[in-house]
């Protein structure tokens, strides 16, 4: 047979509707001869083939092709192969040489190597549009007529290459396709993108850029504080905190005097025991839930801790914080009742959060549970143990403590707590008296008070009245408010009052002005509104869907899944489980329940604080850039933010930032409004409106539901009103009024003055039955009018409040980009006029510490099962460390390097032996003990820890590596605690710096008879380091 060997064929196929090349073999450079010579095989069907299954079988006959058709197929295959090679060569050259191929050009800026590529006829083929078989739809390609066209047209946002793109002329490397520009950057013109793309402007919101945790050029959220500013801030802090520090010290001195009286000791001889708690533990009183910062009393048997305030109350005859759990009886009657109908009681337990939302949308309310209430409607006590919370804040809830169960009956009944005539408090568990213990070095707070008083006597403190009581720049020459000032906003109409106007500067005014103007208003407890803070940022999008894309994780070991979240339904204030994408769809387009009422959902603290910083580093950086008055608000190094003064290894409260995402409507609905109910924050706060979206108009049938709501309110809430027709008209009219909402308005704020709180609480207690809360049930009782967070005052109640008590709040609209600074102690409520995304951050200013202490006293008197009971701020601990930090800044003393976090005694980690050497090595001469006896005492304590560790080990484990680690950890714990709590009277000089380590070694040598390999190895390590 005279045929040429066939080496390969190039085939052009369409797979799944997409054109592409699939090469089976390398194409032969020889000319293939497809003319079949005449053979005898044609007659009998060709030669037989052998196979495993079919044995000898004949191949299928194929129709013969004429010579011209075969030749055309070979030419086409060779043409396509050459086309692919040309495209690859062109792409490599273009990627190497930054040249632009103009349409129709074959010279000029085009590289020589690709001049042979025909841009005209085959321009589509170069970009990947390969000729396909007849009848097949060709693949969509990029329009080659775009100026700056290149073969590489992959969009930076979506990573697709089959779309029309805009190429950046600044970096000449990034491209954005038109669909992405229309979807994610609708406010940016395509011509502007071509001049300078979003990547170059640091506003790109693709997932990769949003998760970029490196510093970007031109964006710096750090606050640079000069030494002079540090000194001035320290003087201001000491002047503000000295009275509070004295109060803390007096409280401790009084308890020490009681201790001296009980045991017949002199005051100087009182030595409270070390509580052996670690810096990253959070210890609070088991009775009043107040944070314990230093001195407290403890039961050795049941591990009960009691703060000094509770000790004083018990000795006075009654523990005021010992109260019974409160019960709120809110009954679930279904969605029909929530919209004015009778409804029927649903007795099934709320097992699934997602059932409630499904019921509202699908319409099966009677046979499914209604969801989980946000509060505690049945009044049952928490399932959580009532004992103290020790350990890290991020401990898993499944971790079981080693402590024995504690009998908590004595927490509820004050009569069980008693003290004898001497002042000894006996624990109700029957184990004996409570022991006085400490967390800080003995006498440290008294020493701080003495140092601050000496500094004040030397005239080194900043005189507070001179800085804030000068004439405000907002006032005119007659010392009256200049109402024509552009930095003032009228927010109230109180007669005879000069605080109807709020200070509202722009972000640029705040940056150019000093802090005195702000302090003038802030020290009076007035909120401040800083306008257009987003102008100081790069312009990164805060649209919730953009943030959702950055946080979205289908499956990730570290981050987990964030597809489903728990939201709050603003109609009945119950928690529901909702898909995050569906939630954001309702955020922009609006959603309605099966009865036609707006379904308003609210996300609080989404994403969680840890995810916000990890998955949204760009947004976290952007938020820090937008913060106004950074000396007060910066969460890392704000010199006047007391929250940053805590030691690095200390457990810090969660101060944010936190996001609040919710849909909203301009019209006040009366029920189901997107509101944050009346409350007081535990500290100062700054709230920035970062994004708004207007929801389309409501459905027409909503008016009928409003009328049913008003009839139900008249029947259940206002049954005692004489003129019911007039009241009915008032209710309907109040819900028909639409707030005057401008384009950039987002939220309506009502902030009450501190001096108006007694009248506000009196009004709520008087009219509390006119409000609804869980399941739209009337509020039956009031524990605390503000801390219950059960009330939102509508425009009707705001009007009635002014008529009856003569008070009114500051009321204003928060616009897009406005930052509202709320002083602690000012009750406030918020209603969203549009769908809003707000980001909030807490901080503690020196001026408002007294209000933080006042709120702490109120929290401790709430019932044990009240959600606001626990003191999460720990302001007294903050005061002590802030004073210490300020004194060190004034004296020029550098802050000590943070110790490695000590682990819990029950489960110490490995590598602790190295921590011992480092802790001893880093000690300054002033921190060494001054006597041989003190050294001997510490050494004996360390060796005793070794002895105990060895005795507790089984014989088989004495020489194991695990045993060595556990004993070393015990050594570290004992040594660290002894070194940490060295009193000021036992300091030693520089010459005695090297005494400690040799004494420890000698003590080990005397006890070497144990013969443990662990002890020998540790002694050798100590001798080799020779500190």
From Swiss-Prot:
GO molecular function, one term: histone H3K9 demethylase activity
Domain (JmjC): residue spans on this chain: 635-860
Entry GO CC: nucleus
Cofactor(s) needed by this chain: Fe(2+)
Zinc finger residue ranges, RING-type: 155-201
Zn finger region (B box-type): 280-310
Bias kind Basic and acidic residues: ranges: 8-17, 64-74, 346-370, 379-410, 889-903, 919-932, 948-965, 975-996
Region annotation Disordered: where it falls in the sequence: 1-74, 346-410, 889-1000
GO BP of this protein: epigenetic regulation of gene expression; stomatal lineage progression
Domain of life, per lineage: Eukaryota
Reactions catalysed, as given in the entry: N(6),N(6)-dimethyl-L-lysyl(9)-[histone H3] + 2-oxoglutarate + O2 = N(6)-methyl-L-lysyl(9)-[histone H3] + formaldehyde + succinate + CO2; N(6)-methyl-L-lysyl(9)-[histone H3] + 2-oxoglutarate + O2 = L-lysyl(9)-[histone H3] + formaldehyde + succinate + CO2; N(6),N(6)-dimethyl-L-lysyl(9)-[histone H3] + 2 2-oxoglutarate + 2 O2 = L-lysyl(9)-[histone H3] + 2 formaldehyde + 2 succinate + 2 CO2
Residues binding Zn(2+) 3: 285, 288, 302, 310
Residue ranges of the motif Nuclear localization signal 1: 48-55
Residues the record lists as binding Zn(2+) 1: 155, 158, 177, 180
Enzyme nomenclature, EC number: 1.14.11.65
Basic residues compositional bias, start-end: 48-63
The keyword Metal-binding appears for this protein: yes
Cofactor remark from the record: Binds 1 Fe(2+) ion per subunit.
Residues that hold Zn(2+) 2 according to the record: 168, 171, 197, 200
Chain span(s) of sequence motif Nuclear localization signal 2: 121-128
Family in the record: Belongs to the JARID1 histone demethylase family.
Protein name from the UniProt record: Lysine-specific demethylase JMJ25
